Curated annotation (Swiss-Prot):
GO terms for molecular function: 1,2-diacylglycerol 3-beta-galactosyltransferase activity. It comes from Nicotiana tabacum (Common tobacco). This is Probable monogalactosyldiacylglycerol synthase, chloroplastic. Its EC number is 2.4.1.46. It is an enzyme of class 2 (transferase).
Length: 535
């Protein structure tokens, strides 16, 4: 068994502290003075989308850096109440600060030096250039389309979805597409914005801080203002990052990857040339920043998410409900349970429960494993009624503690695994937190799910999603969870079987293939040549 070193999470500062404080100041000090009759929670979310715009007129000679485009954000609010004047004054001061930074920092592709001539395979700014010569048969081949997937390692689900999409492109279209994955915030923004993943991990570990951040930034007025302010500091670096890949398709699998890139594309008139799609990786509840009206396509994992997208202003033709993209290996058949259990060192004919806590091995795994060790042992007959497969991920300390325990039942402890489809295929049910990717994979394998935790905000809706569809239960108590499993492996086996059938009905194993084929169709319909540089 391979052991992996555990990760150490430090406590960084919040890179969006300044922006959040300004947004909170605007919201708290202004909206509280506006009467409910004129400025309600139902109306303020529409204000900024109607009155926030950027004057980004780009001239043809902007590439020579003589006339750099400037972003001039202007906010104007029409509220027929005396208290509106104080609200407008605060926003005026906020806009003045943003305008100052916009004048200092050029925006968009025009601010990036691009050489469209002969480059011998190398462009300025480290651009990715492929060999597009003539093959040996003398016939010029069409260069592959370039796909850029934008993600961030804030949780494991975004990277997993990005990898699944890349694998599907490779399997379905081979060398017709070149797929690149980039962590936009870490790799293409300046400090402190490039500390986003570390800040997220810190906030999630302090649940109340994350809950406050999630819901405080949900109103459109707040997050649009935050993005407007943030863009003035990161737009140039983000533009360089996009130009590095010269993409034909941009795919966002993260809620913070829509607004800034789309603003840059719009400022350069590239929205009709570059396909921009969003693949939402939250099953039910999702943050409003997932939705942007300028996307070419928004792929929703469920009808509930599609309804949210419509309420956010997207049009029906922009939406496709295909399911959550999971790795293509989950679509392929796996060997029978007996064979998989033998390969994993498990008992071949004993019911098995899979216990996991994500890539970092988070959650009450040890307490739950010990409770299962007691509940799945028949004291009367002196024999086990079930077995446990524990996935510790990169949590080396947890791995060492569990492997040192003298168990009364068969317990297999694994570190970080890459073939999760085989681990799930070897088991009869699963205990996990409410991560959308794990839920989507579990229902494909027909596993009843016991959810033992969730992240406030984006994962909260996954609990009723599982329960209401009849494919699982929820409990935070290790003892209650162990008793549920013991019942499923004993007198309530029929309930386990019914939940397994419900899970299979909920599964969408081909979602990732439908997504990439729809993107391929968008490329075919648009029929544009890869862009060297904007005019």
């Amino acid at each position: 068994m391979m052991q992996h070193s555990s990760s150490v999470t430090q406590e960084p500062t919040n890179p969006f502290g300044f922006v959040s404080q300004v947004g909170s100041f605007v919201f708290n000090n202004s909206c509280s003075r506006v009467s409910k009759s004129n400025f309600t929670l139902d109306s303020y979310s529409n204000l900024l989308s109607n009155y926030l715009y950027f004057d980004c007129n780009v001239k043809k000679d902007s590439l020579n850096h003589k006339n750099k485009p400037k972003a001039s954000p202007l906010l104007s609010l029409s509220i027929s109440n005396k208290s509106a004047s104080s609200f407008s004054r605060v926003l005026f001061q906020f806009n003045k600060a943003i305008r100052f930074h916009c004048e200092k920092i050029p925006l968009g592709f025009a601010s990036v030096g691009v050489n469209c001539g002969e480059s011998n395979g190398v462009r300025e700014e480290g651009s990715v250039v492929e060999n597009e010569g003539i093959p040996d048969n003398g016939v010029e081949s069409e260069p592959p389309k370039k796909v850029l997937i934008l993600m961030s390692d804030t949780g494991g689900g975004h990277r997993a979805s990005a990898e699944a999409i890349r694998s599907a492109f490779n399997e379905e279209f081979g060398d017709k597409y070149q797929v690149f994955i980039t962590d936009l915030w870490t790799e293409h923004t300046p400090w402190p914005f490039n500390q986003l993943p570390r800040s997220y991990n810190f906030l999630v570990k302090h649940g109340s801080l994350w809950r406050m951040t999630y819901y405080a930034t949900a109103p459109r007025l707040v997050h649009q203002t935050n993005f407007a302010a943030t863009s003035t500091f990161i737009a140039r670096e983000v533009a360089k990052g996009l130009m590095k890949y010269q993409p034909d398709i941009i795919i966002s699998v993260h809620p913070l990857m829509q607004h800034v890139p789309l603003r840059i594309l719009r400022s350069k008139g590239l929205l009709k040339k570059i396909i921009f799609t969003t693949v939402i990786t939250d099953l039910s509840t999702c943050h409003p920043t997932w939705f942007h009206k300028l996307v070419t396509r928004c792929y929703c994992p469920s009808e509930e998410v599609a309804k949210r997208a419509l309420r956010a202003g997207l049009k029906p033709y922009q939406l496709k409900v295909y399911g959550l993209p999971v790795r293509p290996s989950f679509v392929k058949p796996v060997p029978p349970k007996v064979e998989l259990r033998k390969e994993l060192g498990m008992e071949e004919h004993l019911p098995a429960v899979l216990l996991m806590g994500g890539g970092e091995g988070m959650g009450p795994i040890e307490a739950t494993a010990r409770a299962l060790g007691d509940a799945l042992y028949d004291e009367i007959h002196g024999e086990p009624i079930g077995q446990v497969l524990v996935i510790c991920g990169r949590n080396k300390k947890l791995f060492n503690r569990l492997t040192s325990v003298q168990w009364k039942i068969p317990v297999q402890v694994k570190g970080f695994v890459t073939k999760m489809e085989e681990c799930m295929g070897a088991c009869d049910c699963i205990i996990t937190k409410a991560g959308p990717g794990t839920i989507a994979e579990a229902v494909i394998r027909g596993l009843p799910i016991i959810l033992n935790d969730y992240i406030a905000g984006q994962e909260a809706g996954n609990v009723p999603y599982v329960i209401e569809n009849g494919c699982g239960k929820f409990s935070k108590s290790p003892k209650k969870i162990a008793n549920i499993v013991a019942q499923w492996f004993g007198p309530r086996q029929d309930e386990l079987r019914i939940m397994s059938q419900n899970a299979l009905r909920l599964a969408r194993p081909d979602a990732v293939f439908k997504i990439v084929h729809d993107m391929h169709e968008l490329v075919r319909q648009r029929n544009f040549e890869p862009q060297c540089c904007p005019a």
